[in-house]
């Protein structure tokens, strides 16, 4: 009988790898809800499409490697990779952009290194970097917060039937880069210093903070990594 080696952690407790992955997916739901509220249904469409593409890509590469497909798909790592990448993409992303990013993340950044636990880099972020370098225009087209298109418009953006130019707007990072060196203009610009939650970005950040607190409360993560990351951003 052939033995199937599973990825770590090799424990006898109830929290297996799939359970941990599902908890992280649950933690993204507040962020997904707020992104949908502020930017429309494009993020939901992206997530669903990315998950489907990730599962198909994972199944094909597992089949090619002679690995049991169902056994490895149930660890939810491909689903989590797809969700994280889709949440990082603009809600105006066309279908092919998401497909390229997810395919590269699963096939190259994850499976070519041997699968879960063997890849040196986060597959979702590898896919994101590939898209940012290869398609910088498409990756920086965001809808203005609070001006969410309808479900039909979001679908038309996804399929490429509706041009994104008339709906997209500058992000805070775009504005900061444009006005860098001109502190007076930067300080008075509404997109950076608007009324609390008036521009939507604060609510997005708070929603993902809520997800992080959920993971800490469930002991899925500890406070050290997020605090260290934020300190690295804040300290010179």
Task: Name what the model sees in each region.
Residues 27-34, 58, 78-86, 102-109, ...:
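Hydrophobic, membrane-inserted alpha-helices
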Residues 1-63:
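N-terminal signal-anchor module of multipass membrane proteins
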Residues 40-53, 92-101, 194-206:
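Structural signature of hydrophobic alpha-helical transmembrane segments
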């Amino acid at each position: 009988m052939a033995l199937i080696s599973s990825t770590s952690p090799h424990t006898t407790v109830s929290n297996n790898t799939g359970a941990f992955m599902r908890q992280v997916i649950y933690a993204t739901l507040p962020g997904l809800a707020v992104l949908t509220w502020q930017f429309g249904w494009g993020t939901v469409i992206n997530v669903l499409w990315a998950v489907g593409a990730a599962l198909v890509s994972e199944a094909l590469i597992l089949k090619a490697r002679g690995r049991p497909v169902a056994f490895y798909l149930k660890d939810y790592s491909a689903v989590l990779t797809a969700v994280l990448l889709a949440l990082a993409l603009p809600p105006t992303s066309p279908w092919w952009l998401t497909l390229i990013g997810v395919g590269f993340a699963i096939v190259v950044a994850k499976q070519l290194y041997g699968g879960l636990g063997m890849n040196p880099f986060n597959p979702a972020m590898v896919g994101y970097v590939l898209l940012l370098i290869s398609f910088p225009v498409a990756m920086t087209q965001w809808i203005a917060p609070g001006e969410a298109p309808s479900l039909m418009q979001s679908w038309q953006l996804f399929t490429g039937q509706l041009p994104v130019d008339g709906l997209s707007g500058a992000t805070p990072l775009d504005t900061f880069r444009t006005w860098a060196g001109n502190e007076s203009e930067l300080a008075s610009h509404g997109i950076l210093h608007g009324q609390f939650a008036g521009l939507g970005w604060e609510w997005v950040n708070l929603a993902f903070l809520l997800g992080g607190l959920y993971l800490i409360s469930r002991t899925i993560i500890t406070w050290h990594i997020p605090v260290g990351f934020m300190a690295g951003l804040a300290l010179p």
